[in-house]
């Protein structure tokens, strides 16, 4: 099991494959993705690497973190994430990981924070059909209707689909295909959509499940 990477979402575009078909892709950019610290079985009880990416201003970095970066001999990083790895995949502190870490055609799992939509109704949040447009319905056209309970059980069950806060959740999309990489510019092109807004930090790992045949 090897380390994943930290990348930043640039946006979406489309590219053409060898068959001349256009493929929608999300462009991710890697900037200064380096190993900041390591975790070992002897010292920590498990094996992992801590990666840092992006550039943070020194004045915005705490004194404790400045000390950690100084020990690793790397510039202050804007984003830190820890990845569990096997002992044979443990990287040295200061090692930089580039876009060539992934190969075209391989499958990856991508983790990001979805775009927040605020308080949303049941129609937008869950795809409900709403109530009738006429025939006695007034004001409640976009309502979710009955919550489905009466004296017994006398309550609304947890996880009932209702209006509420939508988005701004941590989501992992599995088995996305890497279309191509550009190591010189630090770009990874991933087929399809990736959770998060433009500029959001994205975690990319090797896929843990095989794709459905």
Curated annotation (Swiss-Prot):
UniProt PTM comment: Methylated by PrmB.
Molecular function per GO: rRNA binding; structural constituent of ribosome
Positions of post-translational N5-methylglutamine modification: 151
Pfam family of the protein (one): Ribosomal_L3
One term under GO cellular component: cytosolic large ribosomal subunit
Ubl conjugation among keywords: no
Gene3D superfamilies named in the record: 3.30.160.810, Translation factors
PROSITE patterns, A to Z: RIBOSOMAL_L3 (PS00474)
Known partners and oligomeric status: Part of the 50S ribosomal subunit. Forms a cluster with proteins L14 and L19.
Protein name: Large ribosomal subunit protein uL3
Organism encoding this protein: Rhizobium johnstonii (strain DSM 114642 / LMG 32736 / 3841)
């Amino acid at each position: 099991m090897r380390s994943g990477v930290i990348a930043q979402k640039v946006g979406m575009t489309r590219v053409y494959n060898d068959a001349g078909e256009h493929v929608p892709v999300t462009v991710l950019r890697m900037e200064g993705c380096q190993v900041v610290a390591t975790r070992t079985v002897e010292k920590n009880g498990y094996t992992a690497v801590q990666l840092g990416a992006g550039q943070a201003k020194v004045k915005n970095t705490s004194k404790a973190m400045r000390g950690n970066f100084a020990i690793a001999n790397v510039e202050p990083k804007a984003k830190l994430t820890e990845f569990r790895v096997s002992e044979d995949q443990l990287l040295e502190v200061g090692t930089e990981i580039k876009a060539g870490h992934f190969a075209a055609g391989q499958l990856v799992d991508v983790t990001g924070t979805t775009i927040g939509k605020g308080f949303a109704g049941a129609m937008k949040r869950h795809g409900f059909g709403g109530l009738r447009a006429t025939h006695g319905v007034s004001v409640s056209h976009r309502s979710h209707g009955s919550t489905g309970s009466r004296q017994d059980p006398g309550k609304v069950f947890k996880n009932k689909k209702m209006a509420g806060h939508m988005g701004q959740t941590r989501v992992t999309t599995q088995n996305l295909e890497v279309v191509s990489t550009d190591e010189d510019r630090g770009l990874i092109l991933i087929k399809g959509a990736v959770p998060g807004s433009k500029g959001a930090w994205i975690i990319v790992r090797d896929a843990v499940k095989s794709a459905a045949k």
